[in-house]
């Protein structure tokens, strides 16, 4: 069974243009995301789904430099872009990760992926309801459900946000990976604003290098320590 991690990426963020190519600890944000995705247990391939326009050529080039496969598709119809990438890859299971989450955790993602690839759910995530820091969000689904959504979803919001059709469908067997409890959802580890960028730059200056820096517990320890400095 081919399990593909597909990362959506583009330059045209309305709140922070070009964020995926911004430097973070001597590499781009996108490079961090793709490296982490390549370490997800059970993943066979990592693909970056990039809009098919000239402005996003640098994003595609950076993804290729990082060793990811690149699929080009519609900028606005993100669902169609994902479905096209999954078909192109011959994927049976698809994991969705966004490119503004440079602290995405491979182990958490692997646990979500296993809920579909091994346990038989049609769709799985770790935010139904939210219980992890914002920035560790991931989703996995059977490619057949992704293809069905691409064919049947009609609302603009369903095309833009990829999975609402699947998440809301009564026939879809869903599973959720619950967080460790406490006040985890109050932590924000994603990149949408200049303030987020400043925070993440400080986080990466303090995180240990290499695989030890990937675990969400390491990021949490750094954030808690920073708050008490």
Segments predicted by a language model, with ranges:
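Short beta-strand-to-loop acidic/aromatic patch adjacent to the donor-nucleotide binding site
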Residues: 86, 91-101
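Glycine-rich, basic loop-to-helix element that forms the pyrophosphate-binding segment
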Residues: 77-84
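Active-site oxyanion/phosphate-handling segment shared across diverse enzymes
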Residues: 141-226
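A short, N-terminal amphipathic alpha-helix
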Residues: 29-46, 59-61, 65-66
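N-terminal nucleotide-binding beta1-loop-alpha1 segment
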Residues: 1-16
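A conserved acidic beta->alpha catalytic loop
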Residues: 51-56
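Conserved donor-nucleotide/metal-binding helix-loop-beta segment in metal-dependent transferases, i.e.
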Residues: 105-131
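Acidic metal-phosphate-binding loop of nucleotide-sugar-dependent transferases
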Residues: 75-76, 101-103
């Amino acid at each position: 069974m081919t399990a593909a991690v597909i990362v959506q990426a583009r330059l045209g963020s309305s709140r922070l243009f070009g964020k995926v190519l911004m430097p973070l600890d001597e590499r781009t944000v996108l490079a961090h995301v793709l490296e982490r995705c390549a370490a997800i247990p059970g993943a066979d391939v990592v693909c970056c789904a990039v809009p098919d326009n000239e402005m996003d050529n640098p994003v595609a080039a950076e993804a290729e430099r990082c060793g990811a496969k690149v699929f080009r598709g519609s900028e606005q119809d993100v669902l169609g872009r994902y479905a096209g990438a999954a078909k192109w890859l011959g994927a049976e299971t698809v994991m969705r990760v966004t490119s503004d989450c440079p602290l995405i955790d491979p182990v958490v993602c692997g646990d979500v992926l296993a809920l579909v690839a091994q346990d038989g759910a049609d769709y799985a995530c770790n935010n139904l309801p939210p219980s992890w820091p914002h920035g560790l969000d991931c989703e996995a689904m059977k490619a057949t459900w992704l293809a069905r959504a691409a064919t049947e979803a009609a609302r603009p919001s369903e095309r833009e946000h990829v999975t609402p059709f699947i998440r809301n469908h009564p026939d879809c067997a869903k599973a959720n990976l619950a967080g460790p409890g406490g006040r985890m959802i109050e932590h924000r580890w994603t990149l949408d604003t200049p303030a987020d960028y400043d925070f993440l730059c400080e986080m990466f200056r303090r995180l240990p290098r290499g695989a030890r820096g990937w675990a969400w517990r390491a990021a949490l320890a750094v954030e808690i320590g920073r708050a008490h400095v």
